[in-house]
Amino acid sequence: MFDVNLFDELRIGLATAEDIRRWSKGEVKKPETINYRTLKPEKDGLFCERIFGPTRDWECACGKYKRVRYKGIICERCGVEVTKSKVRRERMGHIELAAPVTHIWYFKGVPSRLGYLLDLAPKDLERIIYFAANIITSVDEEARHNDQSTLEAEMLLEKKDVEDDVEAEIAERAAKLEQDLAELEAAGAKADARRKVQNAADKEMQHIRERGEREVARLDEIWNTFIKLAPKQMIIDETIYEELVDRYEDYFTGGMGAEAIQTLIRNFDLEAEAEELKEIINNGKGQKKMRALKRLKVVAAFLRSGNDPAGMVLDAIPVIPPELRPMVQLDGGRFATSDLNDLYRRVINRNNRLKRMIDLGAPEIIVNNEKRMLQESVDALFDNGRRGRPVTGPGNRPLKSLSDLLKGKQGRFRQNLLGKRVDYSGRSVIIVGPQLKLHECGLPKLMALELFKPFVMKRLVENDYAQNIKSAKRMVERQRPEVWDVLEEAISEHPVMLNRAPTLHRLGIQAFEPKLVEGKAIQLHPLACEAFNADFDGDQMAVHLPLSAEAQAEARVLMLASNNILSPASGKPLAMPRLDMVTGLYYLTMDKGEDEIGGEGRYQPATEDRPEQGVYSSYAEAIMARDRGVLGLQAPIKVRISHLRPPSDIEAEQFPDGWQKGQAWLAETTLGRIMFNDLLPWNYPYLEGVMVRKGGAGNKMLLGDVINDLAAKYPMITVAQVLDKMKDAGFYWATRSGVTITMHDVLVLPNKTEVLESYEKEAERIERKYWEQGALTERERYDRLVELWKDATDTVGNAVEEMYPDDNPIPMIVKSGAAGNMRQIWTLAGMKGMVVNSKGDYITRPIKTSFREGLSVLEYFNNSHGSRKGLADTALRTADSGYLTRRLVDVAQDVIVREEDCGTRQGVRVPLGIEVAPGSYDLHELWETSASGRVVANDVKDENGEVIAEAGTDLTEELSRTIVNAGVLEIKVRSVLTCQTPAGVCAKCYGKSMASGQLVDIGEAVGIVAAQSIGEPGTQLTMRTFHQGGVGGDITGGLPRVQELFEARNPKNRAPIASVDGTVSLSDEGNFWTLTITPDDGSDNVVYEKLSKRQGLAQVRRPMESNPDAMIERSLRDGDHVSTGDRLMRGAPDPHDVLEVLGRRGVEKHLIDEVQAVYRAQGVAIHDKHIEIIIRQMLRRGTVIDAGTTDLLPGNLIDLSEAKQVNAAQVAEGGQPAQLRSEIMGITKASLATESWLSAASFQETTRVLTDAAINKRSDQLIGLKENVIIGKLIPAGTGISRYRNISVKPTEAARNAAYSIPTYGDSIYGDDGFGEFTGASVPLEEDYTF
């Protein structure tokens, strides 16, 4: 086998018959496969050993030569080469066709390449190929011109002969008539009889005359056709063509079928045709010019690539190796065979029959019919079903052709090349492993033994437990006791990778240190669940084993769970306490103000009678008080603390030089909060507040913010240790808090019936107005009832909320953010409220009961509509979201960080801060998703002109606050949208990696990270289109809206946008508006006609007439002023319009804002840079308007960076540069237009992409990831980029000793908190290790 690393590009082209014969090891002449008795391949058949190689290693077919010593010998008896049977996967054969056939891809594909080349309509081409019409292939015009007068004279003579014959025949008939009449008269016949004879004779003479005229007309037609005969002329009438051949075969050639096409192609002058087409393009217009452009594309492709167009017509077809179309014996003695064998057999059968008929000299009509059948059988082999009805096998199933083997999810590309099943893997159900550290997982003993079998066997032999590998294998299979000890050794410090399907983002596969566990289930760390989106209700996970030292090192350094705490999409922590852990930490840090034990130990200020109570000299004393039973966790106390850093305000006040460990300070806190702070690093400022997961206000603190802050200030290993401590503490205190839910914890509102009475009356009033008085429309009734019952639900819900005491477990679970929300408590204890039907509209009767009371039958029925719709929606959404992710990955897969800095000074402006009060500033609400993690593009100066931030500085939160406090609210930052790196992006334009908080590494596959970050939350987005109540129809939202934006589609309710600044005037045209903008600059008015009133005019913010300081939202009116790019109607603008009016930057901003609006509505945080990467790919190409003196074709799409280089070269040579128009392409179109044909073919429309690539002889430079995965090369990302290849690292002795000296944390009340012998820290190397 050849080495994939030996080449840097892959080219595809058209194979000629010579190429096919050169690849082939022999001709397949018989349709036989294998002998049913001997089960040996038939000679010259589809499995022939002489052609394809031996079926058994080192053995010829007849058995004369056996064993490897005869390697390379060709047996003189059977003709089989003695070699490995593996060659049957590589060796090809061929079938010599008795008549040429066209390749169906090139004639039937859209557009028809053969049709464009020969300037024939596909319909005509089909007639010729399938023997329904003749075509003239060449005309000897000179000979025809020279002999024309002679031939004409001959034709006139022939016509005269015909006329003379007719006259003679008529005269003869007239004479016979005379004779007949005379005889009748002599016999005394009546006048009637004479008239009959006369009429019959007249009729007959008329027929003779007409026949003569027809014959003359036919001769005229033949002559006129011959005189005008030109190449590529089609003659459908078979008789005329035969006459032409009989009379004038020396002056022209013609024919039907692929032979005629082949002759035309061989006579075709590509260069002359190209010149002619260029002439038409330069001077022509309209349809003619468009067709010439399309034809020139095909002609130029053949000229440029050097492909021989004759390759589109085949004289021989290849037969793929037999191992790729196997035939296997089933249990019952029958055979299962690949469909290809059936298709090949049809071809061979028809080909052999055609040969026989030609040899026998069969009539032409029979031969042509056989040729047509041969053409059809080759079509079926190449692409079954492309033309006409597909060839079917048993059970009416269409047979899978060569094209079908490549296409679709089950095709070669997606099934076997982009995703393979691998060895050293297993899968099992997952269960929770609360005792594990973050970097560990529990691996069942049996599974581990099977996975690590080779390693265990090797060690058994090394440690002298077994003599050889065979006995070691037996020991492992019998599970001897010593095997387990050796297994422990084998798995130590050998990470495994866990994966849960669907792998929606890169954290769906992470590395863990295995720990052996009993049972058969994999144990997963509770904090890793969020990233995997795993729960323990029967989920399964797959285990993979990294084998090589490099793979293990990467798994450990890059993929270990404790190194992947932050989300690559937003930079927020994913490994965060949740559910029970949150409840535990909430319980631990609550401040009851009252002591749950008895009150003696809590803090009480001094009174006249007694001194201060509840003041402790140390944390230890407070714990002792708790052990004695006088102090509760949540009681307020005062305590002297010296082992934890004070909060920043106390530190600033009491320790102006900075606090040192051991210095004491007095804290007013609770014992639980000290315990919580004990979990954090000792030098982290003391946190005084209740820990919650969401809804942090007042003295509540968000756990996420704490972990975010830790991740920013401490190394990952410290954060991982803290998270593990939090997990242990969370579970420990959740257990001890006794928080559970029982039915009795659900308190029912006692006065609900009275509360609902008034609403019932109001509902009756609305119904009466509609039914009896007719005072309301159907829509008004619906809106009022919905509003009324929503208000009722809120009233009941709020009453329920107030009724619950703080220590009730249900509000505790909700308020801590562990699970659920208040709305769910309302449905449990208040009322369910309004529910939707299957269309998504509200049912106007609410569900008045709660789940605690139970629903009535009707209520249950009403409720089931919405529930079912929810389930159906989720299923559809999952599929749609997966497809969106796939398209995003495909469009961005080749965006990799290629260099440190592209050197551009360009950037985009982002909002940094807002003025909250005069002179007081704060960070902008969108700072986290737009400005954070960027690099400053230009020097930022304050109002005095002093530089606050230099260009190239990382924009941290601290620096952002400094800039904002200086009054600078918007700055220019580097962005991938303005990056000048040709293929990929540079690190400075990308900024920080959200997952690490550091500047992104060179080689990072940021395109795929972006696609996953956008696609992964896709399932959370809704499928609903939002109703606008009356006007304007529906607004598309959720997932459909995101798809609409990324596909750059014309939106459903398209809103026109103002193309100039100016004043609006409206004129009413019945159902439509006509809107005119009078531009401010005095240019011509811009008129927008037929604007639907149903859609409604755009909403604008304008000052109130009564109070100009206040702003209101109202519809656009006569006399309003609009700016360029403003919407004129409700709905969404078309991205193509935005690009035209506002330019490239305008459409970039529009798309980012619109996509973010959808995700923010669902509470999903995604950084703008991910969306920017996709948009950059959508805007990468432009259309050539004027080619100048370049070789580009007008109307062609071309990469803008490539066009830049071409233009620069032209200008340097003194030529005219090409002019381009920016284009916005949807992600599907952009994926298919990629430079890499391998990537495009594996995405969609495989046959079309391959057809196009072959004609253009496209070379794949193997720049992206997909193309390298397909051919099995190391991907050019991460550690696979060229700069990291062939590195050898040898650690020094000191480095070896220091390899795992790692900080561990001391014991605490939660048991051993040491991180185990391995924690995931990377090996420190000496300074001189430069890569």
From Swiss-Prot:
GO terms for biological process: DNA-templated transcription. Binds 1 Mg(2+) ion per subunit. Pfam families: RNA_pol_Rpb1_1, RNA_pol_Rpb1_2, RNA_pol_Rpb1_3, RNA_pol_Rpb1_4, RNA_pol_Rpb1_5. The keyword Secreted does not apply. Keywords: DNA-directed RNA polymerase, Magnesium, Metal-binding, Nucleotidyltransferase, Transcription, Transferase, Zinc. It catalyses: RNA(n) + a ribonucleoside 5'-triphosphate = RNA(n+1) + diphosphate. HAMAP family: RNApol_bact_RpoC (MF_01322). Belongs to the RNA polymerase beta' chain family. This is DNA-directed RNA polymerase subunit beta'.
